[in-house]
Amino acid sequence: FENVLYPNIPSLLNSLKEQGYTLVIATSKPTIFADEILKYFEIHHYFDCIVGSNLDGTRSSKTEIIQYILNKYKDHDSSEFIMIGDRRHDIIGANNSGIDSVGVTYGYGSLEEVKSSKPTYIADSVEQLREIIINSK
């Protein structure tokens, strides 16, 4: 896999699950591949739902994926959702869907890319991400 599991992510996921958060993956990757990546890194069990693109190329934009998730969890208010992403399309998808977002600067996107997409919050570390999530509850 070309993916990297950032230090302290398993600890953060475990902490959020213990606090009762519902964790959902919203990825542009096909769902089946995202599922395999999560299993490879042994973090699959933290997630309640994994939503990606379909193998036929449909539901491929981040906005479509987030809208699908919001519809699936329509018993939750949109203010309860926060999109965490490292690329502009993650943040734009959140903005288009009316939910808060955290742009993380330690992923694949540059600081400039993340900032220019206007996230609600910016996190430079997993610890900052943890603080943002807990304080935005």
Regions from the PLM with identified roles:
Residues 10-18, 70, 91-95:
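Surface-exposed amphipathic alpha-helices with a cationic face
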Residues 8, 33-36, 93, 113, ...:
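Phosphate- and divalent-cation-binding pockets in alpha/beta enzyme and binding domains
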